[in-house]
Amino acid sequence: MIQRNRELKIQTVMNHIEEQVPGIKFLQVLKDNDAVIRIAFNHEHPYGKTWSRVGREAERVNSNEPTMNLSDITGHESGGIQEGSKEYGCIMHELLHTLGMHHEHQHPDRPFDISAIGTCAFDFIL
């Protein structure tokens, strides 16, 4: 039952993405090894408890390994998931990574240089 509740939460967020973003469709496959997005709920990783591979990087992961981990998503309660909840945001965040989106501060075209900001702040304080 816990696993099914988790799956329903993820499916709810996937449905929201499909409704809001033209051209995006998540397809369920019959065999786990055929899936590009493979979600675990307890996979230890240096990335932390909740993480996802970004974009096509998932295609380079062994087919028996997860490409996303959602340890923070519980399945103890039934009744789905509410938009705006912490779990909803967490699932959305990781699914968007799966679709190829990076954090804004990691984008190569960002309008600022993080190392320069640190240097300027340090120089200014002196």
Task: Identify what each model region corresponds to.
Residues 1-126:
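Zinc-dependent metalloendopeptidases
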